[in-house]
């Protein structure tokens, strides 16, 4: 049988999905702190007015349980539903002072909600990370939490002859479009020399994102006239991660402790507060016995108080193990003030347990 004569039998299965986004603003957020399991509920909301399927958000500022006591816990709650259950995927993020998404987190699967049941994230964001960057994440003491809900609806099977070609959604994300400018050197107007590599870039984007780049372009220097600028003391890969953040706002690939530290240093050098927060949060999440001392040095060097507090607390809790690490021994020799001053001030404000832990460290 020839190809033209073959019968082509095909069909399509369409799973209906309804999506909506809910934005919840909590004013005077700093007054919401309390004990573990203390919760705040949002107003009840629905996809459309008077719909029987109703939801609300729930926040635990001090964590849902003992394990998550250092975090902000967030949940999506099914308040009412006429059916036995609803399957829905959900996404959470914080809207920062610039209107950008921060701490974007989504469900890995599509859980089933029953009436009064909730799903969410017990360790959504470190509370210290949130509070230590108030101007960026809590402008005017307001937390703006966003949740996108995708509800699974009916499953419809359709034969091929009845199929209507789907119209592609023409919308594009701004970050994706700017990312294309970063990937393609078209219309660039300056060159950046980094560790023997030349990178083409756009002055307007760099100046808008970084006050350091803006000042560099404004000054009447020979490099400016030639539109060629040498970037010193930065690793090429670190610089690429920083530039990717400048163009897209997306979190960098921090595949190691040293990379997170190097990108943090670059973020501070070029005035990128958002990138600095991301690196700080990554270092907090990945504290270990081996890197705790070096993390403390980095925190002290770059004046990141939240990271310093977390590192000091980690060292206090794991005093005997940290004191045996090579990083601790190196820190005692190179940064004795962190032992003599910071540890002493922290121990005086902590419990007897912490004081005894630091005595162990001081006597090492």
UniProtKB/Swiss-Prot annotation:
Residues 188-255 form the BTB domain. InterPro entries: BTB/POZ_dom, MATH/TRAF_dom, SKP1/BTB/POZ_sf, TRAF-like. Pfam families: BTB, MATH_2. Belongs to the Tdpoz family. Residues 19-149 form the MATH domain. SUPFAM superfamilies: POZ domain (SSF54695), TRAF domain-like (SSF49599). This is TD and POZ domain-containing protein 2. The lineage of its organism: Eukaryota, Metazoa, Chordata, Craniata, Vertebrata. One of its GO terms (biological process) is protein catabolic process.
